[in-house]
Amino acid sequence: SYGYDEKSAGGISVPGPMGPSGPRGLPGPPGAPGPQGFQGPPGEPGEPGSGPMGPRGPPGPPGKNGDDGEAGKPGRPGERGPPGPQGARGLPGTAGLPGMKGHRGFSGLDGAKGDAGPAGPKGEPGSPGENGAPGQMGPRGLPGERGRPGASGPAGARGNDGATGAAGPPGPTGPAGPPGFPGAVGAKGEAGPQGARGSEGPQGVRGEPGPPGPAGAAGPAGNPGADGQPGAKGANGAPGIAGAPGFPGARGPSGPQGPSGPPGPKGNSGEPGAPGSKGDTGAKGEPGPTGIQGPPGPAGEEGKRGARGEPGPTGLPGPPGERGGPGSRGFPGADGVAGPKGPAGERGSPGPAGPKGSPGEAGRPGEAGLPGAKGLTGSPGSPGPDGKTGPPGPAGQDGRPGPPGPPGARGQAGVMGFPGPKGAERGVPGPPGAVGPAGKDGEAGAQGPPGPAGPAGERGEQGPAGSPGFQGLPGPAGPPGEAGKPGEQGVPGDLGAPGPSGARGVQGPPGPAGPRGGDAGAPGAPGSQGAPGLQGMPGERGAAGLPGPKGDRGDAGPKGADGAPGKDGVRGLTGPIGPPGPAGAPGDKGESGPSGPAGPTGARGAPGDRGEPGPPGPAGFAGPPGADGQPGAKGEPGDAGAKGDAGPPGPAGPTGPPGPIGNVGAPGPKGARGSAGPPGATGFPGAAGRVGPPGPSGNAGPPGPPGPVGKEGGKGPRGETGPAGRPGEVGPPGPPGPSGEKGSPGADGPAGAPGTPGPQGISGQRGVVGLPGQRGERGFPGLPGPSGEPGKQGPSGSSGERGPPGPVGPPGLAGPPGESGREGSPGAEGSPGRDGSPGPKGDRGETGPGPPGAPGAPGAPGPVGPAGKNGDRGETGPAGPAGPAGPAGARGPAGPQGPRGDKGETGEQGDRGIKGHRGFSGLQGPAGPPGSPGEQGPSGASGPAGPRGPPGSAGSPGKDGLNGLPGPIGPPGPRGRTGDAGPVGPPGPPGPPGPPGPP
């Protein structure tokens, strides 16, 4: 006969012809005596009598925590209970026929030997066959049921209760806290499991309710761009002889903007820094003073049932019991291991052919085989004709317009011009002469002492964005920061009106094939669900093959290498519940959490005298769950208890509140629009049919012949605007757009009338520094006055490195300078302004009549005048050569979402690939050990709202999800009114027995 092997339960077995009955086996060896029964644990004490619970008394004044009482002496161990009866020894059963080798059973708990079962019916004697080889000894039978615990011994006498410490004097009342700002009311979190009640902390005086907080802004503005690096400050020349103040020159036209340089290569990514060491746990602060107890709050919701407690320690083994009488006959033992195959006997004469048996039941389907090797990819078929263009879908809503982008970085300051020669003492003004040629720049003078700081100048025009700098080396990893408090939930902004849908562009010609890309990038975000495909024709089902005979079991081969994990197989039927496994070892103690904030240090009271133990009072009402206490010291590991029954699945937790809306990123540059292709012919719109119910998915049939190309349908009516979809992933920043053309310079203003220079007055005494006046409007440039005599050549200073000259702009028409205004009183010293770009050099004036005067003594440096306006922005210099490729920088945060670009042209439809064969379902692997729960990651910022995706098909109902993490504790709500006194509750459960008292 063919046996049934559970390890190959999936195969189909074919019943073979019945073989001749073998000889009756010899009686098996006597069974091993059962193990010694465990002594039962001591009996539980009787339940104390319960009476009706009286009303709760008024709360007494809070007292300080008294000093720890003296530890009670260990109680005497209880008397050992009488030994339980010993199970009867079973009679030896008859040895069964050698069966197939069964799988190894789970090791159960050693229990007392069970009662022997009734003897089986005697088999009919079979025809004498050849004597087989003696079979091997059968495996050890499954352990019997665990013996019942013996009668419990008498309970030990209850020890005296320890003396209760005297209540300390009440601590001082803490000062009333300032009224807090009420935050947004947090969503009600799922009630977590009721924790152990911790020690009551100090209760401060209730603060006054604060005013309602203002509504949050719609969203913060984008971060301002980083200022460009200022250029190198030129050396200050030696203070020369103060010359006559020159007239400001006319403002020249701005030159054309230079082309932008190519972006530099992306640097390599730096090595990650070493993780910082975890900081030491802070010391536990002393408990603060106990505040005045407030009125009792409303009764909280009933907490969930706590987790099952750890099993108690196993009692000491009792003395061996008396030997019991013989028990009833035990159940027959398990089949023994199959013996070695005996030598083949002589072939007997064939017997008469028996009648044809009835067909047997169909065997179980075999297990799915290993997945076959992946077939070779076939050659691509010829491209089929283009399919019909479907009707256009409804236009999606335009996204909300993003806020303006951050200002670009400030451009670098232009090259500092060389200072001109200082003029000598002003002579008698001569008649204005003709304009002479421009003189050469003099050498720079020696660096003078730094002057007082001038007032801060106005902010200059926005410079062009600088090229990105090289990626710096990664800094060392800092210590882990403390977790911040959860921020208040912002007010959701108003949803903007949907913009009009843009017209669809014409299809452009396909572009040339691009170069081969680099390494594969990171996997992208999961895309939205596509539209359901067309249902294929069901294929023909093949004929089932005949099941082959079951072969002999081969020897176990060497263990192969671990294969690749297969796909998730079809879930099998739920098997029977196996015997309970051995209890696992207790897990390691987790790391201690961060210590909470320390309360104010209270004054330590003097320890009171030890009072007499009072009678136990009635059990009070169940108070609200207290805060979690500090983790206690790790105790000694107890004996492993028996595995409890699996509890029912908890209810599904409520859906958490939506997270705060993240900041809307700044719009990126608008991409270039592609070239338009030739427009196609417009077809007639087809009639829209009724949408039928979706049918069952059939097997994919063979691809049909390509159909004719249909005409393009007309544009359908615009559908209703759907609700906004979930926020999409932030797309990569688009390429920068081309620079616009620079406008032409404006015409010069009218020339002012020339003024007559007045005589030079006598220098007055230096006045007191007055308050800085308000900055007046800039006047028109005046006419040029007579130029002074040229000054003597100053000492040459150290020449600085000259930067690359920028392109020279077209010279502007110089207007006539106006007359010099009176010197105003010096203003207060302000902060130094930024270095402005050098203005255009004026023409050199004529030399006036008269001999040059002797140089005057250098006067005291005058007060710094008001800072002038920033000059015109210099032209952008040519792009320098590309520097060496730096190390690749770490991946930066996602950039702001750019504006929605124009809809690209629809590319040509690609060839339809050959449908691959469906892979075999892999064998279901063994369940791995449960991983340790990871830490909860920080909440990510919510992205901007993306367009609504197509409606997906209804998915199968998922399993009940686990309870979500409890939400953050919301701010305290307003104080509720005092409720009516409730009815007296039922008596509480009896408390745990107290510790044994001293003997």
UniProtKB/Swiss-Prot annotation:
The lineage of its organism: Eukaryota, Metazoa, Chordata, Craniata, Vertebrata. Residues 115-131, 149-167, 215-254, 374-400, 462-489, 522-535, 592-606, 619-646, 675-691, 720-729, 739-754, 816-831, 885-899, 933-966 have a biased composition (Low complexity). The modification 4-hydroxyproline is found at residues 27, 30, 33, 42, 45, 48, 62, 77, 83, 92, 98, 125, 128, 134, 143, 149, 170, 179, 182, 209, 212, 224, 230, 239, 245, 248, 263, 272, 275, 287, 296, 311, 317, 326, 332, 350, 359, 365, 371, 380, 383, 392, 401, 407, 419, 429, 432, 450, 468, 474, 480, 486, 492, 498, 510, 526, 532, 538, 547, 565, 580, 586, 607, 613, 616, 625, 631, 649, 658, 667, 679, 685, 694, 703, 706, 727, 736, 745, 754, 772, 781, 784, 790, 805, 811, 817, 826, 832, 852, 855, 858, 930, 933, 951, 966, 972, 987, 990, 993, 996, 999. Residues 169-181, 648-660, 804-814, 849-864, 984-999 have a biased composition (Pro residues). The modification Allysine is found at residue 7. The keyword Secreted applies. This is Collagen alpha-1(I) chain. Trimers of one alpha 2(I) and two alpha 1(I) chains.
